[in-house]
Regions:
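N-terminal amphipathic/basic-hydrophobic helices that include classical n-h-c signal peptides
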Residues: 1-9
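A glycine-rich, hydrophobic loop/mini-helix early in the fold
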Residues: 44-76
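Nudix hydrolase/Nudix homology domain
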Residues: 2-3, 31-33, 70, 111-192
Length: 192
């Protein structure tokens, strides 16, 4: 049901997530798969890495992922472990998933609830981080099957024309990513 029993995938499925309320206040923890089956609101993170040309690094989720396998999404998506904040989790997961290290900046947060496949509900309070690097990724094959760079205008058109190729959370937050990226890139230019 959840792919092969590769140790990385098995460990990920048996991890616990941080349950939160609508204000992102911790209300408990739950086994990751149980939280997704029951549709419990939990803390998550999404990392968006751009190159110096402003192109977004996308990953194609590995086909054996427990949901949304084969779909294109942002650079890195995950959950903090109990006792871990989202910034630390983002800095842990980016190299684990994509073999990248770079400075991350908090961009925004959003909440969404979507059934991503039969029996799996993503109900997340998602913390979004941006980073910039021209270093090419070295994806972990258990996490990402492929990667590509797209400018935000091209991605916007493809999201409209081929929505089934992309994860639900990317489609939901894309408009906010675009507006937040303008602010982020302006701040980067001012710092140079």
């Amino acid at each position: 049901l959840f792919g092969d029993n590769d140790n990385n995938e098995y460990m990920e499925i048996n991890e616990h997530v941080i349950l939160v309320d609508e204000s992102d206040q911790i209300v408990g923890t739950m086994e990751k798969m149980e939280a997704h089956v029951k549709g419990k609101l939990h803390r998550a993170l999404s990392v968006f890495i751009f190159n110096s040309r402003g192109e977004l690094l996308l990953q194609q989720r590995a086909p054996e992922k427990y949901h949304s396998g084969g779909k294109w999404t942002n650079t890195c998506c995950s959950h903090p472990r109990p006792g871990e904040d989202t910034f630390a989790a983002a800095n842990r997961r980016l190299p684990e998933e994509m073999g990248l290290h770079c400075s991350l900046t908090f961009a925004f947060s959003f909440t969404y609830c979507k059934t991503v496949q039969k029996g799996i509900i993503e109900y997340e309070y998602d913390h979004v981080y941006f980073g910039t690097t021209d270093v090419l990724p070295s994806p972990n094959a258990a996490e990402a099957a492929a990667f590509r760079y797209l400018d935000l205008g091209t991605l916007e058109v493809d999201l409209e024309n081929n929505p089934d190729h992309y994860t639900e959370w990317l489609k939901i937050c894309f408009t906010q990513v675009k507006s937040s990226y303008r602010q982020y890139s302006n701040q980067l230019n001012l710092a140079r």
